[in-house]
Amino acid sequence: MSMSPKHTTPFSVSDILSPLEESYKKVGMEGGGLGAPLAAYRQGQAAPPAAAMQQHAVGHHGAVTAAYHMTAAGVPQLSHSAVGGYCNGNLGNMSELPPYQDTMRNSASGPGWYGANPDPRFPAISRFMGPASGMNMSGMGGLGSLGDVSKNMAPLPSAPRRKRRVLFSQAQVYELERRFKQQKYLSAPEREHLASMIHLTPTQVKIWFQNHRYKMKRQAKDKAAQQQLQQDSGGGGGGGGGAGCPQQQQAQQQSPRRVAVPVLVKDGKPCQAGAPAPGAASLQSHAQQQAQQQAQAAQAAAAAISVGSGGAGLGAHPGHQPGSAGQSPDLAHHAASPAGLQGQVSSLSHLNSSGSDYGAMSCSTLLYGRTW
């Protein structure tokens, strides 16, 4: 069973365009109703607003009713009465309104917006600079009034400023240092008394003592560190073998060693290499004296023995006496001895000479006996 519509839609050009022409005609005829509200709007207060709104509503209702009837007839309506007016360029009496550009150019405010600009590159800036300058001037007036108000207002409480540093006089510093040497810490009464003496406040005295204590501690610490560094450098220099280091030379100069050095030149004259020292000369002279005394005692004993054994034969050989009259070399050596010993030697000299003659005689007799 074929489903065919009862009413066929004509597709010819005349069938399609004829309903549109009729609808345009009706819209044009009924569009005159919109002229009344527009005319009333242009006249301003000639008609009350309520009447103008009522007329506008009636005209709009008529256009909508016409469009509804055309839709029911089977022709689709794609335009409104206002749309038709916009499309055709006029809407009843809307064509009487001048364009927006002409209105703005002819108005009083037109030159402010569209005035002649010397530089055509900045058309948009000129339209904003004019009103902005007036606005800025008015704003500056407001700022000036604010400045006057700020002058009259009391300043806001800010952070406390640091006081200027007070320089103490030499007398004050001397008194503070003298008291610091005596006592590093002061009680409140002592602090007040010292402050009154040197014309300072107790707070200033307190702060000065605190700073000076810290200064002394820091100086002592730096001094100890410096001494420790010097000791470390002096002890480690021997292992490193750096004899030319100035720190090591300074340490050697500070602690010299005493070494016996032979004197080669004294008072500009060269000393003898074998010359004994003064102490050694005194010891040698004492030993010589002891040896001389022992030799003299031995000679005295020998002389006594020779006198007791053969004193009669002394005169048998007188030729030997002249030789005995002279001093012997031993006596010449003893002459250099002290005066006390010279007396003893002189008393025994004749005995020594006689003893020597007797010895010579005995030796000669034996020699003669052997030869014969």
UniProtKB/Swiss-Prot annotation:
<dbReference type="GO" id="GO:0021895">
    <property type="term" value="P:cerebral cortex neuron differentiation"/>
</dbReference>
<dbReference type="GO" id="GO:0010719">
    <property type="term" value="P:negative regulation of epithelial to mesenchymal transition"/>
</dbReference>
<dbReference type="GO" id="GO:0007420">
    <property type="term" value="P:brain development"/>
</dbReference>
<dbReference type="GO" id="GO:0005667">
    <property type="term" value="C:transcription regulator complex"/>
</dbReference>
<protein>
    <recommendedName>
        <fullName>Homeobox protein Nkx-2.1</fullName>
    </recommendedName>
</protein>
<dbReference type="GO" id="GO:0007389">
    <property type="term" value="P:pattern specification process"/>
</dbReference>
<dbReference type="GO" id="GO:0000122">
    <property type="term" value="P:negative regulation of transcription by RNA polymerase II"/>
</dbReference>
<keyword id="KW-0804">Transcription</keyword>
<dbReference type="GO" id="GO:0006357">
    <property type="term" value="P:regulation of transcription by RNA polymerase II"/>
</dbReference>
<comment type="function">
    <text>Transcription factor that binds and activates the promoter of thyroid specific genes such as thyroglobulin, thyroperoxidase, and thyrotropin receptor. Crucial in the maintenance of the thyroid differentiation phenotype. May play a role in lung development and surfactant homeostasis. Forms a regulatory loop with GRHL2 that coordinates lung epithelial cell morphogenesis and differentiation. Activates the transcription of GNRHR and plays a role in enhancing the circadian oscillation of its gene expression. Represses the transcription of the circadian transcriptional repressor NR1D1.</text>
</comment>
<dbReference type="GO" id="GO:0019899">
    <property type="term" value="F:enzyme binding"/>
</dbReference>
<dbReference type="GO" id="GO:0097154">
    <property type="term" value="P:GABAergic neuron differentiation"/>
</dbReference>
<dbReference type="GO" id="GO:0021879">
    <property type="term" value="P:forebrain neuron differentiation"/>
</dbReference>
<dbReference type="GO" id="GO:0010467">
    <property type="term" value="P:gene expression"/>
</dbReference>
<keyword id="KW-0805">Transcription regulation</keyword>
<dbReference type="GO" id="GO:0007626">
    <property type="term" value="P:locomotory behavior"/>
</dbReference>
<dbReference type="GO" id="GO:0021983">
    <property type="term" value="P:pituitary gland development"/>
</dbReference>
<dbReference type="GO" id="GO:0030324">
    <property type="term" value="P:lung development"/>
</dbReference>
<dbReference type="GO" id="GO:0021766">
    <property type="term" value="P:hippocampus development"/>
</dbReference>
<feature type="region of interest" description="Disordered">
    <location>
        <begin position="312"/>
        <end position="340"/>
    </location>
</feature>
<dbReference type="GO" id="GO:0042753">
    <property type="term" value="P:positive regulation of circadian rhythm"/>
</dbReference>
<dbReference type="GO" id="GO:0030878">
    <property type="term" value="P:thyroid gland development"/>
</dbReference>
<feature type="compositionally biased region" description="Low complexity">
    <location>
        <begin position="245"/>
        <end position="254"/>
    </location>
</feature>
<dbReference type="GO" id="GO:0043565">
    <property type="term" value="F:sequence-specific DNA binding"/>
</dbReference>
<dbReference type="GO" id="GO:0001161">
    <property type="term" value="F:intronic transcription regulatory region sequence-specific DNA binding"/>
</dbReference>
<dbReference type="GO" id="GO:0060486">
    <property type="term" value="P:club cell differentiation"/>
</dbReference>
<dbReference type="GO" id="GO:0000981">
    <property type="term" value="F:DNA-binding transcription factor activity, RNA polymerase II-specific"/>
</dbReference>
<keyword id="KW-0010">Activator</keyword>
<keyword id="KW-0371">Homeobox</keyword>
<dbReference type="GO" id="GO:0006644">
    <property type="term" value="P:phospholipid metabolic process"/>
</dbReference>
<feature type="DNA-binding region" description="Homeobox">
    <location>
        <begin position="161"/>
        <end position="220"/>
    </location>
</feature>
<dbReference type="GO" id="GO:0021892">
    <property type="term" value="P:cerebral cortex GABAergic interneuron differentiation"/>
</dbReference>
<dbReference type="Pfam" id="PF00046">
    <property type="entry name" value="Homeodomain"/>
</dbReference>
<dbReference type="GO" id="GO:0045893">
    <property type="term" value="P:positive regulation of DNA-templated transcription"/>
</dbReference>
<keyword id="KW-0678">Repressor</keyword>
<dbReference type="GO" id="GO:0005634">
    <property type="term" value="C:nucleus"/>
</dbReference>
<comment type="similarity">
    <text>Belongs to the NK-2 homeobox family.</text>
</comment>
<dbReference type="InterPro" id="IPR017970">
    <property type="entry name" value="Homeobox_CS"/>
</dbReference>
<dbReference type="GO" id="GO:0060510">
    <property type="term" value="P:type II pneumocyte differentiation"/>
</dbReference>
<dbReference type="GO" id="GO:0007492">
    <property type="term" value="P:endoderm development"/>
</dbReference>
<dbReference type="GO" id="GO:0045892">
    <property type="term" value="P:negative regulation of DNA-templated transcription"/>
</dbReference>
<dbReference type="GO" id="GO:0045944">
    <property type="term" value="P:positive regulation of transcription by RNA polymerase II"/>
</dbReference>
